[in-house]
Regions:
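Boundary at the C-terminal end of the N-terminal hydrophobic targeting segment
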Residues: 3-5
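Active-site-proximal N-terminal segment of extracellular/periplasmic enzymes that hydrolyze or transfer
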Residues: 7-63
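Histidine-centered active-site microenvironments of extracellular/periplasmic hydrolases
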Residues: 15-19, 320-321, 329-352
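A long, amphipathic alpha-helix that forms part
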Residues: 16, 42, 243-269, 282-323
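Second-shell loop/turn segments in exported
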Residues: 21, 39-46, 70-71, 132-138, ...
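Beta-strand elements within well-structured catalytic alpha/beta cores of enzymes
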Residues: 27-39, 58, 84, 151, ...
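Short, structured active-site-proximal loop/turn typified by the sulfatase FGly-forming signature C/S-X-P-X-R
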Residues: 43-92, 157-163
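His/Asp/Glu-rich, glycine-adjacent segments
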Residues: 89, 94-271, 280-287
Length: 352
């Protein structure tokens, strides 16, 4: 599988398959987890504070790849996710950045954009949202197949579903032949595109109605003596989308993944299924506060518990011996200039 990587080159990755005596036996479920903007050094920096059933379980009971490299630039979210799941580089799969200028057409291209599609949702402002860009998405800009596409070609009965707060984090990993991809719109609700379906499944509609982003944005996000952020104030300013800039964006995504496992019965049939999960809040928080901020550490300690919850649910519903899980990152992030300057490393800002 692909690797964790900074926006330099090196990184790590790990995967888990435990309990199967016959390694050629096909898994019932493959779960791909991408942690957006995760640097390889986070594993070492936060190791002592991680629990035993999240990151540590994957590392201690699985395979831990420490020395990997990206063979391309830029290492953004779009090309990162596409490269992980296609197994090739942007020059081949076509997702060369998050967005780019096409000289032949004279258009600016968004990596997951598709003007021929429309939003599918049960949104508060449905008529407006259907016409918005939130759901005008598909993987049509990706020129190659993902491993999930190859699985669907082999067995069309396999289910493939991708989820993320970001549209590109859900769409590109799931591939062209996916059954579904879900991401969060500007209201903080789960939506999809007409590329996949005409109506949201009932259980996704129920999540939007009963498990809204506002339910998570109560009180404060704080660590004593380190920071305190008023979640209700954030909601009043930005609405449900404010959850993306908090660790509770990872929580609501985890809750969606558990609902999908239950309602879609992934891994509980004869066919091999695929679930791709991309945690995006780590990227939003990383950009807002920087990789050395206390908010980052707290976010990853909370994410460790989310991963533990997912692994526990997989073990209960599918059986650990029937699941392959891999976890990696689409890219990392450079250190803040002020952090480097404190260590007497030349750094600074410039206007480009």
């Amino acid at each position: 599988f692909q690797s964790f990587a900074q926006k330099k080159s090196k990184g790590i990755s790990f995967s888990l398959q435990v309990g199967s005596e016959n390694e050629t036996e096909k898994p019932k479920l493959v779960v791909g987890i991408v942690v957006d903007q995760m640097r390889y050094d986070y594993i070492y920096r936060f190791w002592d504070d991680f629990g035993n059933d999240g990151f540590k379980k994957l590392i201690n009971e699985g395979h831990f790849f420490r020395n990997c490299q990206f063979g391309y630039v830029p290492t953004y979210t779009g090309p990162g996710h596409a490269s992980i799941y296609t197994g090739t580089t942007p020059a081949v799969h076509g997702i060369i950045a998050n967005d780019w200028y096409d000289k032949q057409s004279g258009d600016y291209i968004y990596c997951a954009g598709d003007g021929d599609m429309h939003t599918v949702c049960n949104c508060e402002q449905k008529n407006v949202d259907v016409q918005s860009a939130d759901g005008k998405m598909s993987p049509h800009n990706m020129l190659t197949t993902t491993f999930a596409d190859e699985l669907k070609l082999f067995n069309s009965e396999s289910k493939v579903i991708g989820i993320s707060l970001k549209d590109r984090g859900a769409i590109l990993p799931a591939g062209h032949a996916a059954n579904a991809a879900y991401w969060m719109n500007s209201e903080g609700r789960w939506i999809t595109s007409s590329f996949y379906m005409d109506n949201l499944p009932t259980y996704v509609q129920e999540i939007n109605d009963n498990n809204t982003a506002q339910n998570y944005l109560i009180g404060t996000w704080e660590v004593d003596g380190e920071f305190s952020h008023n979640l209700e104030s954030m909601f009043s300013q930005k609405g449900g989308a404010a959850i993306k800039n908090t660790p509770f964006g990872n929580s609501i995504l985890t809750d969606l993944s558990l609902k999908i496992l239950k309602n879609e019965k992934l891994g509980q049939r004869e066919n091999t299924d695929v679930l791709t999960i991309s945690f995006s809040s780590t990227d939003y928080i990383g950009h807002q506060f920087g990789p050395h901020a206390p908010e980052i550490k707290d976010t990853y300690l909370r994410l460790d518990k989310e991963i533990s919850e997912i692994l526990e649910e997989l073990s209960k519903r599918v059986g650990q011996e029937n699941v392959i899980v891999f976890l990696t990152a689409d890219h990392g992030v450079v250190s803040e200039p002020n952090e480097l300057l404190e260590r007497k490393i030349p750094a600074g800002y410039f206007d480009g």
